[in-house]
Swiss-Prot record:
Source species taxonomy: Bacteria, Pseudomonadati, Pseudomonadota, Betaproteobacteria, Rhodocyclales
Species the sequence originates in: Azoarcus sp. (strain BH72)
UniProt keyword terms in alphabetical order: Cytoplasm, Methyltransferase, Nucleotide biosynthesis, Transferase
EC class (word): transferase
Protein name: Thymidylate synthase
Function: Catalyzes the reductive methylation of 2'-deoxyuridine-5'-monophosphate (dUMP) to 2'-deoxythymidine-5'-monophosphate (dTMP) while utilizing 5,10-methylenetetrahydrofolate (mTHF) as the methyl donor and reductant in the reaction, yielding dihydrofolate (DHF) as a by-product. This enzymatic reaction provides an intracellular de novo source of dTMP, an essential precursor for DNA biosynthesis.
GO CC terms of this entry: cytosol
Keyword Metal-binding: no
CDD domains associated with the record: TS_Pyrimidine_HMase
Membrane spanning residue stretches: none
Amino acid sequence: MQQYLDLMRHVLEHGDRKTDRTGTGTVSVFGWQMRFRLAEGFPLLTTKKLHTRSIIHELLWFIRGDTNIRYLKDHGVSIWDEWADENGDLGPVYGKQWRRWETADGRSVDQLAQLIDGIKRNPDSRRHIVSAWNPGEVGSMALPPCHALFQFYVAGGRLSCQLYQRSADIFLGVPFNIASYALLTMMVAQVCDLEPGDFVWTGGDCHLYLNHLQQAEEQLQRTPYPLPRMILNPEVRDLFAFRFEDFTLEGYTAHPHIKAPVAV
């Protein structure tokens, strides 16, 4: 994933110093894009080992429409712990918006179900969009959505996805987000009888926290390994029926994990 390292190097060399909500401080650039051809391998970072279990379970948690960390905790995933209240609740975050977006007239929209139906019925539509950014509920969320909106595109029997990430924590968050949405693209492609195409990652405020600079420099000294393969259980034909056991990662070789603090 040389593209990811190129982004990290660009921010280190050309980024502007900025303050931020957490008080940590960042080095930041505005606007960046990376494209991953999913036929060439699963875009899971190899210059530091990632916890694939957390990536898969978090995505399944989103798809369930869940907004309480109990499911994550039950499966050994702690990435949302810092933002949950004493009951484990996060407010109307991703799962709520993906599955139960509340309209002005009181209806509830299942954006994921609507998306699948739209891709199957009218693949050439330019409206295959899911948004997690709900201005009416942002203030009630423990953390407003960083990966805010994604769009699917069908051409030549292949399904591609583009994500817009308004706030991109390059060292900790972005590797998870790339893998998560690449996996979602593969899942949606399978249930819609399409082949995975490209995953396009588009970032807004792309930043390295000041307490991640040393770790970023360390990672830039490492040479990427070939990408692994992600195998999905071909018998699953319903997006909402996928389970953790339906995913098999093959050939993942990675450099050791690099620890870094989370900015809350």
